[in-house]
Amino acid sequence: MLEELNAKDKYSFNKLQKRLRRNVGQAIADFNMIEEGDKIMVCLSGGKDSFAMLDILMSLKASAPIHFDLVAVNLDQKQPGFPEHVLPEYLATLGVDFKIVEEDTYSIVKDKVPEGKTTCALCSRLRRGILYRTAQELGCTKIALGHHRDDILETLFLNMFYGGKLKSMPPKLVSDDGKNVVIRPLAYCKEKDLVRYAEVKAFPIIPCNLCGSQENLQRQAIKQMMQDWDRRFPGRIETMFTAIQDVIPSHLLDHKLFDFKSINRDSGIIDGGDKAFDPPELPTAPLLNIDEMDVLDVIEVR
């Protein structure tokens, strides 16, 4: 599809491509996601996000000041209708190392989960264990997952609304088996950017609902809520994402994060203090970060 773009669309896509690469590069730098000599297992589901992640990491690898290796891994869970030939054929054209892991988790899930119930939770646990094991077998030092900015915010609201916790997806963590470091290089990337990127790059997308299970209804509701906010209040999503990067524990209520008990008149003003008897002064418009790629010229797409 890239070859079919007119000059204006090609210019627009070039800005998009530069923005996504910069987003990923910034996340890698901010959280020290990739280090010299790392071997990254890029988990490839066949969806737009993981395809984009692999594509961008391959691009960054070619120009990075450090050396690291990539190996793309897909788990074939033997779902009916899964097109087994698509990923091997596509990955072979890229020249990237890859491994297709075949494990019939579909039959296990269908046997254990009652008809009509969502299979996602059990399927996810089984998949996670297999991928952790595969990373060890391949000698990988990091596991890269394709969660993006919108996934992170959705998880934040899910935990707030349904779990009573101020908690989201970490950009980097140690896996629950204690043997792997998991990274999310797309943490700063917008889903709508990834959708457009996948369309132009014409990735061979594989449907995610081959098992017949439906996405978590609570997550669907949160996603729709955020999309509605984005339409009605442009910039609010960006402001919310900025907020979780600028947390002030002294102005929240978690005494495990801040020692409120020891505060007295000699403590001084903490984090700007608070005008206790005045109404809060809040901006009337969202704090928009102007994307420098929207005002800078860019190189042409080749």
Swiss-Prot record:
Keywords: 4Fe-4S, ATP-binding, Cytoplasm, Iron, Iron-sulfur, Magnesium, Metal-binding, Nucleotide-binding, RNA-binding, Transferase, tRNA processing, tRNA-binding. It catalyses: cytidine(32) in tRNA + S-sulfanyl-L-cysteinyl-[cysteine desulfurase] + AH2 + ATP = 2-thiocytidine(32) in tRNA + L-cysteinyl-[cysteine desulfurase] + A + AMP + diphosphate + H(+). Belongs to the TtcA family. Binds 1 [4Fe-4S] cluster per subunit. The cluster is chelated by three Cys residues, the fourth Fe has a free coordination site that may bind a sulfur atom transferred from the persulfide of IscS. The thiolation reaction likely consists of two steps: a first activation step by ATP to form an adenylated intermediate of the target base of tRNA, and a second nucleophilic substitution step of the sulfur (S) atom supplied by the hydrosulfide attached to the Fe-S cluster. One of its GO terms (cellular component) is cytoplasm. This is tRNA-cytidine(32) 2-sulfurtransferase. InterPro entries: Rossmann-like_a/b/a_fold, TilS/TtcA_N, tRNA_Cyd_32_2_STrfase, tRNA_thiolation_TtcA_Ctu1. It holds the Pfam family ATP_bind_3. It is found in: Cytoplasm. GO terms for molecular function: 4 iron, 4 sulfur cluster binding; ATP binding; magnesium ion binding; sulfurtransferase activity; tRNA binding. The keyword tRNA-binding applies. It comes from Aeromonas salmonicida (strain A449).
